[in-house]
A protein has these predicted regions:
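Conserved hydrolase catalytic core segment
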Residues: 98-108
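Active-site nucleophile loop of the alpha/beta-hydrolase fold
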Residues: 32, 110-118, 142-145
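Active-site-adjacent alpha-helix of alpha/beta-hydrolase-fold enzymes
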Residues: 143-174
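Gly/Ala-rich beta-loop-alpha elbow adjacent to hydrolase catalytic centers
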Residues: 87-92, 96
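Serine-hydrolase catalytic machinery in alpha/beta-hydrolase-like enzymes
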Residues: 1-64, 68-76
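Short beta-strand immediately N-terminal to the catalytic nucleophile in serine-hydrolase-like folds
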Residues: 83-88, 112
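Catalytic His-Asp charge-relay segment
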Residues: 134-146
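Conserved small/polar residues in nucleotide/adenosyl-binding loops
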Residues: 178
């Protein structure tokens, strides 16, 4: 599982998965990212006045992930992985989902409290075909996210439910939503 992280090294995520008795997996945590620039699919204003804008450089990070990070990580494994997943929290959750429309290398995806409020993303997803349909998809959204006064972000619940419906329409065989 490839996991962009804003802080830490992903060990908390891995340990939590072990506590939940998840089957064994390899976790590749990717840090050092300029979150708003490298995980946003296109440019847009920040979420509040005078906030850092979103840079729209996700394609560049995805290219680095596909051409450098994945080959390097998987070359150290004793055998090729049985499946490959991409996961993320917040803006990285948006990136994980967006990646499904860009490449067919991920069979599984998880978006935890994904920034599905991102302007134009749900329409983008509806209007295009995924490069490959994942075998497993997970969506979650915390209760606090739905109560934000921020105009840009306040429809995140509707957008997460819209993505859930899109997964149903696209016949993703194993999907789980905690919304």
């Amino acid at each position: 599982i490839y996991l962009p992280v804003i802080m830490g090294n992903g060990s908390e995520v891995y340990e939590r998965c072990r506590e939940l008795d998840c089957p064994p997996f390899t976790l590749v945590a990717i840090g050092g990212l300029d979150w708003n620039r490298e995980l946003s699919p296109w440019e847009c204003d920040g979420t509040i006045r005078d906030a850092e804008p979103f840079g729209g450089q996700a394609a560049g990070f995805l290219d680095e992930l596909l051409k450098q990070i994945i080959p390097q990580a998987e070359s150290s494994l004793p055998q090729p992985p049985a499946w490959r997943g991409v996961a993320g929290y917040s803006l990285a959750g948006l990136f994980a989902l967006w990646a499904l429309w860009q490449t067919d290398v991920f069979e599984r995806v998880a978006s935890a409290s994904g920034s599905l409020w991102f302007p134009g993303f749900i329409d983008y997803a509806r209007e295009r075909t995924m490069t490959a349909t994942p075998d497993v998809a997970y969506l979650s959204l915390g209760k606090k996210e739905t109560k934000t006064p921020n105009r840009m972000m306040r429809h995140v619940l509707d957008d997460t439910r819209a993505m859930e419906e899109l997964f149903i329409e696209r016949d993703i065989p194993d999907r789980k939503s905690v919304v």
